[in-house]
Amino acid sequence: MGNNVVVLGTQWGDEGKGKIVDLLTERAKYVVRYQGGHNAGHTLVINGEKTVLHLIPSGILRENVTSIIGNGVVLSPAALMKEMKELEDRGIPVRERLLLSEACPLILDYHVALDNAREKARGAKAIGTTGRGIGPAYEDKVARRGLRVGDLFDKETFAEKLKEVMEYHNFQLVNYYKAEAVDYQKVLDDTMAVADILTSMVVDVSDLLDQARQRGDFVMFEGAQGTLLDIDHGTYPYVTSSNTTAGGVATGSGLGPRYVDYVLGILKAYSTRVGAGPFPTELFDETGEFLCKQGNEFGATTGRRRRTGWLDTVAVRRAVQLNSLSGFCLTKLDVLDGLKEVKLCVAYRMPDGREVATTPLAADDWKGVEPIYETMPGWSESTFGVKDRSGLPQAALNYIKRIEELTGVPIDIISTGPDRTETMILRDPFDA
């Protein structure tokens, strides 16, 4: 039996993690975010009602679940307050269900200003960040000048630290980027206005998780973005600023690494990517447009159109290695309904003609990489909302089986629609 279950994306994000986390939290006592910030966009549809969460864990809608934001998450007080208000306006008692690590780095206005100034300065070489200050906040953390939730307990010292760090960043903004300085007093006043709310939710997350483990409580760890955006293992520099892989669970929450029992990789039935960066199977034809339209591939956070392409099992195999995946949840299978044929990328052809079965590491090494495809018959029948494996067309079952063969990982869950009821759980991670 797996008490500590990790749910993470195996591609470039947007795989459908939010729905699956929400579904599986029916049995969980805690749901933990361990990396990223409000650059994530988790969309839940329950009884036809849509909820988009960016920072608060997807378990917040469950009455008997405690949601936790771990130390690996960079926390924007403004974004958190906005999200809390939206949920509280709908009658959800967020403050009774949400806990924070005091070690969460804070995202403040100057981080956002830096993020946008840098993207503007990069011009055509822009990374395609969400412009929400995520990267600069992680930089401050590593440089040991960042302000954290725990600093808010001593307001006088916080004000002094803020003044010092803002002098540093404003100098950079004005003199290097030729941008406007950020107003110190406004940042201080805005942060102080919510300081007591934030500190009232602080808990020792590592200790809480260890006690939960000893009691045998079920805990779900909710990843943001996807494996191929990992700061260390992704398509650098076109990556996010955190560890999106399973290793980030231990460092971003304080759970001992030996206590992870099951890692569920969310796998979209095709590939998508937002922003710049390598994408060997990207489609620029009618099929690419079809996938975008049928899959409603527009970012929950930015509204940007996602790039679309065939499923890349070479890249997914890298995710299998990095995360020691226990099983997959296959999502958006229904988007492929109606295609005469479906393709799987099974290898890459390098510019020198070599065939390789593993992904390059740096973004520059992906240049000129061509996908080698295996083509399979598609299906005309609808898989939307199918709740039993026997109801799937044979061609869809063949597609699922081939993914399992190419990756060496079983597909334990199949999602056939956005609602939590439109799901087949073949093997429950908490029972694995």
Swiss-Prot record:
It catalyses: IMP + L-aspartate + GTP = N(6)-(1,2-dicarboxyethyl)-AMP + GDP + phosphate + 2 H(+). One of its GO terms (cellular component) is cytoplasm. It is an enzyme of class 6 (ligase). Substrate binds at A300, T301, T302, G303, R304, R305, R306. It comes from the Bacteria. GTP binds at residues 13-19, 41-43, 306, 332-334, 415-417. GO terms for biological process: 'de novo' AMP biosynthetic process; IMP metabolic process. Mg(2+) binds at D14, G41. Its EC number is 6.3.4.4. IMP binds at D14, E15, G16, K17, N39, A40, G41, H42, T130, R144, Q225, T240, R304. SMART domains: Adenylsucc_synt (SM00788). CDD domains: AdSS. The active site is at D14, H42. HAMAP family: Adenylosucc_synth. Homodimer. Belongs to the adenylosuccinate synthetase family. Plays an important role in the de novo pathway of purine nucleotide biosynthesis. Catalyzes the first committed step in the biosynthesis of AMP from IMP. This is Adenylosuccinate synthetase. It comes from Shigella sonnei (strain Ss046). The gene is purA.
